[in-house]
């Protein structure tokens, strides 16, 4: 079953701004929240669908990906890794605003904030894209502190619950009928009070580190494809899991081939004598050189399709399409020029031997005849 459009789910136009999207989400989430619908399966499914749509549309980068590629941008498998596990939308703030203590509030747990997703752009050659390759990359990211193992405290130091938020990392404030939830200003969301902060990370639990990674690039990738390396993003706060690393592929321009999907295109120059008489020409392919017969009376612009000689991706092999370009000889000596003049004279008036020229001249004659009427 095809997934519904995210904008349709929230009932907003594609050009809606962030405020409109948030407003629509609040209204629908209030309507279908499980605490209100009490076991209604259909409402639960709608609530999940609403959350999924908001996760994407509330994040600028993910929304841009969705606008360009639709649901395919977040599907796993194939050349581009899908988005799995979003961290862009802050549902805690929204639900704090909407529900607060209305549905048995007052209970608050410390949030586990997954680390940020990271992006790395990599440039590869067409040959590497076609056959697949391994690339060594270097990224600077946040990792859990090796001294305190992410706790933020020196060995033997006391770690107590924050007296302000009581370990929740969030504080709530009553505003008329609603309750707002915000990051605790004293512990900055950690929910902890550390007696003696770690000397390495200064109580943060994370440190910056340069990491060397090897990325396996599958065969058939193209510019814009993304590879998802799960858990290779920034480390989360308070020992929370790391985000993901997205490697974005950029294929360099090739000096011979142009790519369109799985098909490759190239120009093949031949002499005008070969075009007239036929012959054999050597064509470059991704598998090596290939000899191809040029039929007699070939015109410039003719396309030769070599099936299966393009790019193979996901089990499908594209074609190599060669466009014939007839070259005009230059720097002729007098003897050569005279031979060409004799050839030209021998073809004068013989329309069957000059199909393009005769057709053009007939068209010009008709054009001027019509002007004179």
UniProtKB/Swiss-Prot annotation:
It comes from the Bacteria. It is found in: Cytoplasm. The keyword Metal-binding applies. Gene3D superfamilies: DnaJ domain (1.10.287.110), Heat shock protein DnaJ, cysteine-rich domain (2.10.230.10), Urease metallochaperone UreE, N-terminal domain (2.60.260.20). PROSITE patterns: DNAJ_1 (PS00636), DNAJ_2 (PS50076), ZF_CR (PS51188). Its cofactor is Zn(2+). Zn(2+) 2 binds at residues 162, 165, 184, 187. Binds 2 Zn(2+) ions per monomer. A zinc finger (CR-type) spans 132-210. CXXCXGXG motif repeats lie at residues 145-152, 162-169, 184-191, 198-205. GO terms for molecular function: ATP binding; heat shock protein binding; unfolded protein binding; zinc ion binding. Residues 5-70 form the J domain. PANTHER family: CHAPERONE PROTEIN DNAJ (PTHR43096:SF48), DNAJ HOMOLOG 1, MITOCHONDRIAL-RELATED (PTHR43096). Participates actively in the response to hyperosmotic and heat shock by preventing the aggregation of stress-denatured proteins and by disaggregating proteins, also in an autonomous, DnaK-independent fashion. Unfolded proteins bind initially to DnaJ; upon interaction with the DnaJ-bound protein, DnaK hydrolyzes its bound ATP, resulting in the formation of a stable complex. GrpE releases ADP from DnaK; ATP binding to DnaK triggers the release of the substrate protein, thus completing the reaction cycle. Homodimer. The J domain is necessary and sufficient to stimulate DnaK ATPase activity. Zinc center 1 plays an important role in the autonomous, DnaK-independent chaperone activity of DnaJ. Zinc center 2 is essential for interaction with DnaK and for DnaJ activity. This is Chaperone protein DnaJ. The gene is dnaJ.
């Amino acid at each position: 079953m095809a997934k519904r459009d995210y904008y349709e789910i929230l009932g907003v136009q594609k050009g809606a701004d962030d405020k409109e999207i948030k407003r629509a989400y609040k209204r629908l989430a209030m309507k279908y929240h499980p605490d209100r619908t009490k076991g209604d399966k259909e409402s639960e499914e709608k609530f999940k669908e609403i959350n999924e749509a908001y996760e994407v549309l509330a994040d600028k980068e993910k929304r841009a990906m969705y606008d360009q590629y639709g649901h395919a941008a977040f599907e796993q498998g194939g050349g581009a890794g899908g988005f799995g596990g979003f961290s862009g939308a802050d549902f805690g703030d929204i639900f704090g605003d909407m529900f607060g203590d209305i549905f048995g509030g007052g209970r608050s747990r410390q949030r586990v904030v997954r680390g940020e997703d990271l992006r790395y752009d990599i440039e590869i050659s067409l040959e590497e894209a076609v056959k697949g390759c391994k690339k060594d990359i270097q990224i600077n990211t946040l990792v859990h502190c090796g001294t305190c193992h992410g706790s933020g405290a020196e060995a033997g130091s006391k770690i107590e619950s924050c007296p302000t938020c009581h370990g929740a990392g969030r504080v709530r404030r009553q505003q008329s009928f609603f309750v707002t939830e915000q990051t605790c200003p004293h512990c900055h969301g950690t929910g902890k009070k550390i007696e003696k902060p770690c000397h390495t990370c200064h109580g943060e639990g994370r440190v910056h580190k340069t990491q060397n990674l090897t990325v396996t690039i599958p065969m058939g990738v193209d510019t814009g494809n993304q590879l998802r390396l799960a858990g290779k993003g920034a480390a989360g706060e308070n020992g929370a899991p790391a985000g993901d690393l997205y490697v974005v592929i950029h294929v360099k321009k090739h000096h011979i081939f142009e790519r369109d999907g799985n098909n490759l295109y190239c120009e093949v120059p031949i002499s005008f004598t070969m075009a007239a008489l036929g012959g054999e020409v050597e064509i470059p392919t991704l598998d090596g050189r290939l000899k191809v017969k040029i039929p007699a009376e070939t015109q410039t612009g003719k396309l030769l399709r070599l099936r299966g000689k393009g790019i193979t991706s996901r089990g499908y092999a594209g074609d190599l399409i060669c466009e014939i370009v007839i070259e005009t000889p230059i720097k002729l000596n007098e003897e050569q020029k005279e031979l060409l003049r004799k050839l030209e004279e021998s073809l004068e008036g013989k329309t069957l031997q000059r199909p393009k020229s005769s057709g053009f001249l007939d068209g010009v004659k008709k054009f001027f005849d019509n002007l004179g009427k």
